[in-house]
Amino acid sequence: FQAEDGIRDTSVTGVQTCALPIYSGEFIFEGKKVELDGPRAATSLGIEVVYQDLALCDNLDIVHNMFLGREKKRNNVLNEHEMESLARKTLDGLSVRTVKSIRQKVSSLSGGQRQTVAIARSVLWNSKVVILDEPTAALGVAQTEQVLNLVKRLAENGLAVILISHNLNDVFEVADSIAALHLGRMAAQIDKSKIAPQQVIELITTGKSESVGVK
C-alpha cells in the first residue's frame, strides 16, 4: 500500500486483521469468502501483522518476545528449550545475522533489530500473509536496508507480504504490485513494472492518473 500520511492506511490494516469491523464488502482469502469475527480468527487463517509500534517488551529477551502470549509449555511450565529452538530456527530461516544472542533483552537492540524480531515473530506461526505497517519508519539508511532485505526474504520463502509505507523508494525496491490509496479509498492497484513513481504520486494525491488509465 502506498498512500499519503493520515489517509487511514492503518485502519485498512485493522480491517485486514479483523481488529476493526467490516461494514460493507466481502473478505476474500485464498479465493474464498470468509466470515471473521476478530483478530484470532484472522490469525487462525495465517494472517499476521507487525504494527508500527512493534508491541515488543523491552524487559524481555528475544525468545520471550517472539512467543509473547503464545508461550510453549510442558506440565504448566514454560518450555524454554522448545521456544529457544524454534526462535533460532525461525531467525536462521530468514538469514538473520544481526543479533548476537537470542537471549538478548530487546532494550539492547537497535531499531532495525527490533523490527527484525517483530517480523520474525510474525512468521513463527506458519503464517501465509504478513502485513507490515511502515516497517522502515524512523530507521536510518543501513537499518532500512536491513529490514527491506528481510522483506525480500519473506517473499522468497513463499509468504505474501503487504507493505504499508509512505516511502516510495522502499515500495519500489521490494514491491511486485502497488496499491495506491487516495483519501482512504483504493485509487488503483497496478503491477510495479507498469507504473512510475510520479504516477503513484498522482494517484495518492488526486486519485487519478491519465497516464495509467485511471481517470
Each predicted region: which residue ranges?
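Single conserved hydrophobic/aromatic residue that forms the stacking wall/gate
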Residues: F1-C18
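Conserved ABC transporter NBD signature motif
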Residues: G25-L36, A41-L45
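Catalytic Walker B motif of ABC-type/P-loop ATPase nucleotide-binding domains
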Residues: V130-E134
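Helical segment within the ABC ATPase nucleotide-binding domain
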Residues: E145-N157
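H-loop/switch region of ABC-family ATPase nucleotide-binding domains
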Residues: S165-H166
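A short, surface-exposed alpha-helical micro-motif characterized by mixed small hydrophobic
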Residues: V171-E173
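Short, glycine/charged-rich "phosphate-handling" switch motifs in NTP-dependent
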Residues: S177, Q189
